[in-house]
């Protein structure tokens, strides 16, 4: 079942307070150090500041890419920057079950990404226990749009260790819609934090994960 925002949702979205942390219990799951390699041509990696001393490895593998994270971060290409009305999508496969349920997914509206104090983007993630999450980052603050929510659309790791999840964010003139395996799980209006979705679109992967990404695409049209 998908969730949509009406007038009440718009007001709630505007009133969201910053989160101190995206997920609890990180002190029991220390970030691993990973030996980084050369990035694929055209790609940029931006680790969360708290994980800047822990590297991550992002490499071309087969027809897609593989991310082995130490630190949590985002990955993007300048060529994928968009002005409006577009769709970003990718297929994700978690290669190993994590000790904790860490998240991976997509982001849009990335601007000032090289400046930790000014960076902004909207992101959409899933994790191995069948839940999804949507949030907006502005500088050091993370504003929760949808907290961790169970959805039958998200394939769980325990149900099939080699399962994949197709994710998409569709940015249209009046809404931003979020899809898991071709099922719309949520939608928000183009207002407040989601009024301007121009900028970079790319991938986000949290810490201590091994994730394969296939069929990454950014295309015009958000319907």
Region spans (language model):
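Secretory/extracellular carbohydrate-interaction modules
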Residues: 69-141
């Amino acid at each position: 079942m998908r969730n949509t925002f009406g007038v009440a949702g718009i007001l709630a979205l505007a009133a969201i307070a910053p989160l101190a942390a995206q997920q609890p219990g990180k002190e029991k799951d220390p970030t691993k150090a990973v030996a980084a390699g050369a990035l694929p041509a055209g790609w940029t990696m931006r680790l969360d500041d708290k994980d800047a001393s822990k590297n991550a490895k992002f490499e071309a593998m087969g027809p897609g890419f593989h991310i082995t994270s130490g630190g949590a971060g985002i990955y993007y290409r300048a060529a994928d920057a968009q002005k409006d009305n577009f769709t970003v999508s990718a297929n994700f496969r978690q290669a190993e079950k994590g000790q904790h349920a860490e998240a991976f997914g997509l982001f849009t509206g990335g601007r000032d990404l090289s400046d930790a104090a000014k960076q902004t983007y909207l992101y959409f993630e899933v994790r191995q226990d069948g839940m999804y999450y949507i949030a907006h980052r502005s500088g050091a603050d993370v504003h929760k749009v949808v907290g961790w929510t169970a959805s039958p659309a998200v394939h769980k790791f325990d149900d099939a260790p080699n399962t994949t999840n197709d994710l998409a964010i569709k940015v249209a003139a009046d809404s931003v819609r979020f899809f898991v395996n071709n099922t719309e799980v949520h939608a928000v209006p183009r207002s407040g934090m989601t009024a301007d979705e121009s900028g970079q679109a790319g991938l986000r992967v949290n810490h201590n994960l091994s994730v394969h990404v296939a069929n990454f695409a950014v295309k015009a049209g958000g319907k």
